[in-house]
């Protein structure tokens, strides 16, 4: 996005995979890379898991650039455990970051988007949410929640030219680097970014859609209903 002229707020609390701790250098490293390549970016280190954190992220954008046109909900943590052994300490933080985090950031941005009659919201779901994955009842519930979140925003944002879509990416990231093994070499995040750039573009006319993306492949995902029968 920065290479195409977008002015970026890089938010990253810099916590561990399970959400513990923080490290301001995570966001600053990306900002430095963007600036070195000739782009513009500022860092923000707030947690998306609180309303105050979400408001601060959007305020950073308004203070730096005067408006907010694009929100990409991409924060995530993992606390995997089989359902038999899962307790609220594994569920609540995951819901707070993935699902409530998307709400906390998008809600203050939505006010500006409605007023200006334009906005693009891209949320990050997962195959674990859409199709399910062993040991991830918490994560899957949060990620499928983002599908419903996205489709409602698409409906409510239509008359304000706000488009909302969701991606289910497969990529090697700081969160997944210890999970993928050799296949991770073929899953560079740069193979995901083109669809994000497209969904964020002013010419993009789709809304309420789900896209699976990774390794150079993009596929539309949909929820279907059979013809059914009448008794």
Please identify what each model-predicted range represents:
Residues 166, 184-231:
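C-terminal helical subdomain
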Residues 3-4, 112-115, 131, 147, ...:
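Active-site-adjacent segment of SDR/Rossmann-fold oxidoreductases
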Residues 126:
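Residue(s) in the substrate-gating loop at a strand-loop-helix junction
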């Amino acid at each position: 996005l920065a290479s195409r002229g977008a002015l970026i707020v890089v938010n990253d609390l810099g916590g561990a995979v399970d959400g513990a701790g923080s490290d301001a250098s995570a966001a600053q490293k990306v900002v430095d890379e963007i600036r070195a390549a000739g782009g513009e970016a500022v860092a923000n280190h707030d947690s998306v898991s609180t309303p105050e954190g979400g408001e601060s992220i959007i305020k950073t954008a308004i203070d730096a650039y005067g408006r907010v046109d694009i929100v990409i909900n991409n924060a995530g943590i993992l606390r995997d455990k089989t359902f038999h052994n899962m307790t609220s300490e594994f569920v609540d933080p995951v819901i707070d970051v993935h699902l409530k985090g998307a709400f906390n950031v998008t809600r203050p941005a939505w006010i500006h988007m409605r007023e200006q009659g334009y906005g693009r919201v891209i949320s990050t779901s997962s195959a674990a949410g859409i199709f399910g994955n062993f040991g991830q009842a918490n994560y899957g519930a949060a990620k499928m929640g983002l599908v419903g979140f996205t489709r409602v925003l698409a409906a409510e944002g239509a008359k304000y030219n706000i488009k909302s879509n969701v991606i289910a990416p497969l990529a090697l990231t700081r969160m997944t680097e210890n999970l993928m093994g050799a296949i991770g070499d073929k899953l560079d995040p740069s193979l995901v970014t083109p669809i994000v750039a497209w969904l964020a573009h002013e010419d993009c006319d789709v809304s309420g859609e789900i896209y699976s993306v990774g390794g150079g492949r993009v596929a539309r995902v949909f929820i279907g209903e059979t013809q059914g029968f009448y008794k």
